[in-house]
Amino acid sequence: MSVRLSLPAPAKLNLFLHILGRRDDGYHELQTLFQFLDHGDELHFEARQDGQVRLHTEIAGVPHDSNLIVRAARGLQEASGSPQGVDIWLDKRLPMGGGIGGGSSDAATTLLALNHLWQLGWDEDRIAALGLRLGADVPVFTRGRAAFAEGVGEKLTPVDIPEPWYLVVVPQVLVSTAEIFSDPLLTRDSPAIKVRTVLEGDSRNDCQPVVERRYPEVRNALILLNKFVSARLTGTGGCVFGSFPNKAEADKVSALLPDHLQRFVAKGSNVSMLHRKLETLV
C-alpha cells in the first residue's frame, strides 16, 4: 500500500525590509521580519519505490526539472541517499513573483514532507541547511516560526509578535527580484536596527520605491489600499498588505476595493500552518 501525505505551503509577509549593504559576492545584507499567513498552496505526496521524482502539476513558464519542488525532492534524495521516490501534485493558490514566498514555501513543504514520508529522521538544522541551498527564504519556512532575519535572510531569531488579520492585494504583475536588487536607485545603506524598533513602528520596505517606479500596477494597488489602511509592499513584491485587528474589518475594506483587484484575507500566525499540521502526524 502506497503512503500518501497532504500538507499546506503557507504564505509569508515581510513586515519590513531594510537593506544594509551589498556584499562582495553580490548578495545584499538585509534585515526583515517574517510572519506567516493561514493561506497558501497545498501539496500532495505519494511515495514510490523506483526512485523517480515526478511533479504532476505543470507551472506555466517553469520547466519540470527547474521547479523548486523537484529540486528540493532531488536534493534531499541525493543528500540522504534515500532510494525512494515520490509523486507530487500541487494546488497552486499563491502567485509567482508576489513576495509572499510561494516557491520557497513549496520547497520547504516538500523537504519536510519527504523527511516524514521517507522516514529520514533529519533534524530542523539539517533540513534548514539544505533549504538554504535552494533559496534564502526556504529556511524560515522549514523552521516554521515568525522570525527576525539578518544576513541574506538566513540568520533567524524567532519572535513572538501580534497576530493580526491581513488584507493582501495581488497586482497582476511578476516582479523580478534580481531586477529590483540591481536597480541603481535602490537604498543600500539603511542602518541596522533592533527588532524592538520595528515593533515600535520605525521601519519600512526599502524595495518599495523602486517597485512602485517600475511597476505601475503595484503603485496603484498601494494608492487604493492606503485610502483605508496603512499599506506596504511585502518582500520585493508585487503583493501589498494592510493589517487589521479582526477579520470583519479586513473583510469590510476588501469589499470596498475595485472588483478587478485580486485579493485575499488571512490570519497572521507566528507558527506556520504547515508546522501545526506536522505536529498532528504520528
Curated annotation (Swiss-Prot):
Q: EC number(s) for this protein?
A: 2.7.1.148
| Catalytic activity entry | 4-CDP-2-C-methyl-D-erythritol + ATP = 4-CDP-2-C-methyl-D-erythritol 2-phosphate + ADP + H(+)
A Pfam family recorded for this sequence: GHMP_kinases_N
Pathway per its UniProt entry is: Isoprenoid biosynthesis; isopentenyl diphosphate biosynthesis via DXP pathway; isopentenyl diphosphate from 1-deoxy-D-xylulose 5-phosphate: step 3/6
Q: Which Gene3D superfamilies match?
A: 3.30.230.10, GHMP kinase, C-terminal domain (3.30.70.890)
Name the GO terms of the biological process aspect: isopentenyl diphosphate biosynthetic process, methylerythritol 4-phosphate pathway; terpenoid biosynthetic process
What one GO molecular function would you report for this record?
Answer: ATP binding
Q: Which residues bind ATP?
A: 95-105
EC class (word) = transferase
Active site per UniProt: 12, 137
Taxonomically, the superkingdom here is Bacteria
| UniProtKB keywords | ATP-binding, Isoprene biosynthesis, Kinase, Nucleotide-binding, Transferase
Q: Which PANTHER family does the entry link to? A: 4-DIPHOSPHOCYTIDYL-2-C-METHYL-D-ERYTHRITOL KINASE, CHLOROPLASTIC
Q: Which family does it belong to?
A: Belongs to the GHMP kinase family. IspE subfamily.
Q: Which HAMAP family match?
A: IspE
Q: What does this protein do?
A: Catalyzes the phosphorylation of the position 2 hydroxy group of 4-diphosphocytidyl-2C-methyl-D-erythritol.
Protein name according to UniProt: 4-diphosphocytidyl-2-C-methyl-D-erythritol kinase
- Species lineage, top-down? Bacteria, Pseudomonadati, Pseudomonadota, Gammaproteobacteria, Pseudomonadales
